[in-house]
Amino acid sequence: MILDLMRQVGGLAQGATAEVAVTTHHDRELAEKWCARTGNTLVRADVDEAGAGALVVRRGHLPDPTEILGADRLPGVRLWLYTNFHCNLSCDYCCVSSSPQAARRELGAQRIGRIVGEAARWGVRELFLTGGEPFLLPDIGAIISACAETLPTTVLTNGMVFTGRARRALESLPREGLALQISLDSATPELHNSHRGSGTWEKAVAGILLALSLGFRVRVAATVADPGPGELAAFHAFLDDVGIVRDDQLVRPIALEGVASEGLALRRESLVPEVTVTADGVYWHPVAAIDERALVSRTIEPLTPALDAVSRLFAEQWARAAEAVALFPCA
């Protein structure tokens, strides 16, 4: 067994893998010990009940995901909550098909409170509330305030409904431990309005300026398929002038999800998970929160089993990945 390992793994380039045949559980134990002693990695064991089959062994250690992704992007650090799915807009690339006609599918304040408490105890360190448009909910102020009291919270919004009850809810929110992420796709109205509707750019900019004037930390996120020459530079320059720091300026691609007719095709295996809870279940990532292929569990409470499952599945995915997993930054 040891000779087979030396012969098949010893000549590999760093990071390459080889299959090594085994006939018993004892062979696997020997391989595990050899890998531990030699600095190699047993990636996977495809064996039957008797221990016969093949081991996949990697030359060298797996890269530490913390070093590659950063500690703040490891699975389980972030938790996304879809507060609702109905929206005042019908964006033509919405990854979860939100619109004024969409079913509301609200999580509800009490359930959100229970989920957030459990998540904090599990080890989640940051919350993201999204929709739909969260500020359409009559109790959104109480929901956001309770979340921000427990963990640092970011609320994704189109920034267009800050009038009346929603304006009062906005003004009541804490400034510490809370950020508002407002959608704006371009430095001028044409591109933004072509996807989100006539007049939406002006209203989104007004929402950004209002939130800044009220003392909130504001992030701005653009969703852009194929930016033309100079478009991104103009976008960043516009936000610089508005007063949004560069770390709070995000540009992300369109995903081929929801109502989008084009965009980046994603697979669960190619995404670093960011656990996402909706009224329908727990999903692998917020960009795929209505995609059955990304469903982790229909059981929302307790949340711990789903968090554990995602962590375990990602560890397995990381160990056997032949291609790098990719971040899809929603925030």
Tell me what each language-model feature is.
Residues I254-A331:
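Accessory C-terminal segments flanking Radical SAM cores
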Residues E67-G131, F135-E149:
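Conserved alpha-helical substructure of the radical SAM core
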Residues M1-R78, Y82, G108-Q110, R114-E118, ...:
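Domain-level signature for proteins that mediate thiol-based redox and metal-cofactor handling
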Residues C87, C91, L129, V155, ...:
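Conserved, mostly hydrophobic/aromatic
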Residues T83, G131, T157-G159, I182-S186, ...:
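A cross-domain feature marking catalytic cores of carbohydrate-active enzymes
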Residues E126-L127, T150, T154, L178-A179, ...:
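Conserved C-terminal portion of the radical SAM core fold
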Residues Q101-R114, P134-P174, L184-P189, G199-K203, ...:
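Canonical radical SAM enzyme core domain
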Residues L30-G39, R168-L170, A233-V242:
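Short, aromatic/basic amphipathic alpha-helical patches
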